[in-house]
């Protein structure tokens, strides 16, 4: 068998796709991870979104070997191995480690399309932004939040495109408030609500700095999701945020908005994150990182997740 990198890559993709096929059909999952830096020499992440591919190439010290021609070879190899038209396979260079999120625009194609997950519909865009609009590593977490949402007042902080809000609203949350600084992502969240016939007055979208919102909001909530970026120095924010340094303040401020016994789902993709549980003053803290890791994700450090009860 040849040791050519593209052949190793193709063989691994075919093997993983075959392994995941039965699970994906059974769970009605059409968006999933099929390759996650499985071969050390090939630091790529490949996600399937229906009949499209989103491929991320992560920076490494020996990056001079991975020029544009190499990336193009990997792109067409992935498309061929997974029997997807090459024009539907998107390759992006990314800095940092897999699991880091970088908000930002990289193109202007306007190439949105709709995918399904858990009986809900979501808009995604594989070309124009660093991320796609739907974080696949939160698939199980979204379902868990939805399972708790009936009859609850729901708060979604750093809401991105509002996928958690869709799950909560569809499950019967009596109201929801989704907060983000980005006008683009709030509009996207609004479109996701509309796609699911959930664009009603009780589901509010608020453009605000999260800490400022928490400081001024007196409204009580029963269930919340807090999934902040690792770092943020947005000009619109009052102060630069460093999650490791600031997480206690951020979590406590969120818990203050919850009713007694209210539940906060807190998550981060920061691989070196350490939760200061003793400083939170919570009634109960459960580490559900492994319990919420989807079937198609093998790296336990993809993201961390806690269920925190006030």
Give the predicted meaning of each segment.
Residues 1-52, 58:
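Non-catalytic accessory regions of SAM-dependent methyltransferases
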Residues 40, 44-47, 70-135, 143:
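Non-catalytic substrate-recognition/targeting regions of SAM-dependent transferases
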Residues 151-160:
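Conserved class I S-adenosyl-L-methionine
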Residues 161-173:
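Conserved SAM-binding loop of SAM-dependent methyltransferases across substrates and taxa
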Residues 175-180:
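Conserved SAM-binding motif I beta-strand of class I
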Residues 181-225:
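S-adenosyl-L-methionine
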Residues 185, 207, 221-253:
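Mobile active-site "lid"/loop adjacent to the S-adenosyl-L-methionine
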Residues 263-310:
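C-terminal catalytic and target-recognition region of SAM-dependent MTase-like enzymes
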